Amino acid sequence: MTLLESIEGPEDLKGLDAAAMEQLAGEIRDFLISHVSATGGHLGPNLGVVELTLAVHRVFSSPRDSVVFDTGHQSYVHKLLTGRQDFDTLRQEGGLAGYPSRAESEHDIVESSHASSSLSWADGISRGYALTGQHDRHTVAVIGDGALTGGMAWEAVNNIASDRDRKVVIVVNDNGRSYAPTVGGFANHLKDLQASVQQGVDAVRTDRRYEQTLAKAKHLLTASGHLGQAVYRGLHGMKQGIKDVVIPQGIFEDLGMKYVGPVDGHDLAAMEQALTNARNFGGPVIVHAITEKGHGYLPARLDENDQFHSVPVIDPATGKPTGAASARTWTHVFRDEIAAIADERPDVVGITGAMLIPMGLQKMQLAHPERVVDVGIAEQHALTMAAGMAFSGLHPVVGLYATFLNRGFDQLLMDVALHHAGVTVVLDRAGVTGPDGPSHHGMWDLALLQIVPGLHLAAPRDEATMVEELREAVAVSDAPTVVRYPKGAVGAPLPALERFPDGVDVLARNGEAGGPQGEQRDVLIVGVGAMCVTALEVSERLAAHGVSSTVLDPRWVLPVADSVVRTAARHRIVVVIEDGVRAGGIGSLIRQQMRAQGVDTALNEVGLPTEFLEHASRDQILEHTGVTAQRIAQDTLASVLGTRVPYARPAHDDAAAPVSSSGPEPR
């Protein structure tokens, strides 16, 4: 049995000597490299926090003391130390989650993987302990330097610092990166702190007796008249000046919090001492740990892009992917096309939130470095800054993962849309994303965005329509436009049979038409974006059972095109297939538009339930939620055979007549 296998919980660490702890750290690294290489996952971040996490669990007593991990992708070591070593199932259906999970362990508190929230959690937890008399309980928040670029973290620091008696320890895991190198003024400030030297000073400054001595000296001097007050001001100013030169804690202590560090995050003894000092102080303390992402694994350290932030299945010896060469992805299409657009249009600028490479903006940045801005993990700022850029005559393209749009929704609504700003938002990883779990699925955007006045939303089905719709989006100068697409390979081309004048594509007409004018079919299938693949398969399955159908791709799903409504009037049933939540989704909106225009055709909305969907593969999740061609075809066939709904009367004489455009007109 290895030493790691003998660890069933954090208490098992308490009796280990220094040599055993070093051995355990090595075993954990070997375990992570072996197991995460086999399943895929966040390898680099976890290799960088082995000693840090060991020290946290040695000094504090989880779950009595609450340990919160910001973002949570660096919690693998924490899982290993809290009795979860079945990593063969990591990020697989029914197996270990890739992020903290309350269902797995009482040691896990925060499940969301959205960055910069841990300090607000720590503020709330510690306030709760104080108000309920649990003064012996500590709250520890582990947050990366990348997450500290998010404004929410500083809102929490502002509140935590105002109460000097709450037992909050903030461990800054400073590896200089989020996905990629951390950017901005705060990142530069941390680099300045890294250059400082303070050995032994932290032990004094976090001693309550030091604070008490300073308080007594201040009281005696300020109470002794003008001369004493002048002496105090002089001594205090001298102390501050010397401190800022020798040990520049800077912004942290200016906010009223004790600062400990910088500490070598891979030195177990140093980390334990720093955390012990912080714990014993009894008030809010920042512990600044310097770590290396991918520490101890050469392939990760040599990866310039993101130091193995997240890996597929790889060969642990080389770090190279073991599967077939990656197919062209949606991100690749965006990467190439936005770079081409930027070459043609000097007014187009790119904005990203700490995701330059994952979003595909690096190619544009290499060609036009002054026109790509990485704002850090700051979606709110990104969108309002984009509105300002639009006001000054630029056309910003903001690249976000779909799940992170939620963080900047107010800014999209009130700063971009209200001001009719020509801003394009590109949403990668829309829909079901798979193994990263509920906080990474991009399934909320379709419902959220349809309530934004004047917004145009495109959902491309293949590479050609992606290129078209991105170019159409950046041609709009007086309204927000959004282009959404899923994670993964872009797939084969899906050519249209016909394009209506308002931009809606007819992808298929299967089966014999009927009705009084010979133009009606049984089922109209509307595919939203990448779900057009499923829509076409449903149509083929229905045709095999003698049920006729038409397949439409609206291309621009917001606003709803009139030709979609008129085509619906010539069918007995409409089926809308989308990879967002059904509640308030595109199907719901099409139904509203149909009823508003007097079209009473029955409509079935096929999408995701309003639930937090657990981690599994994309196909498994779609199977469980009923969003598969087989299930949709079965349900639709039953509806057709069981219905007595007559063909709806056509709303107009010609479903393909020129109508007002659903896609945005360049302006």
From Swiss-Prot:
Cofactors required: Mg(2+); thiamine diphosphate
SMART domains: Transket_pyr (SM00861)
Record-listed thiamine diphosphate binding positions: 73, 113-115, 146-147, 175, 297, 379
Gene Ontology BP annotations: 1-deoxy-D-xylulose 5-phosphate biosynthetic process; isopentenyl diphosphate biosynthetic process, methylerythritol 4-phosphate pathway; terpenoid biosynthetic process; thiamine biosynthetic process
Keyword flag Metal-binding: yes
GO MF terms held by the record: 1-deoxy-D-xylulose-5-phosphate synthase activity; magnesium ion binding; thiamine pyrophosphate binding
HAMAP family: DXP_synth
Role noted for this protein: Catalyzes the acyloin condensation reaction between C atoms 2 and 3 of pyruvate and glyceraldehyde 3-phosphate to yield 1-deoxy-D-xylulose-5-phosphate (DXP).
NCBIfam families in alphabetical order: dxs, PRK05444.2-2
Protein name, per record: 1-deoxy-D-xylulose-5-phosphate synthase
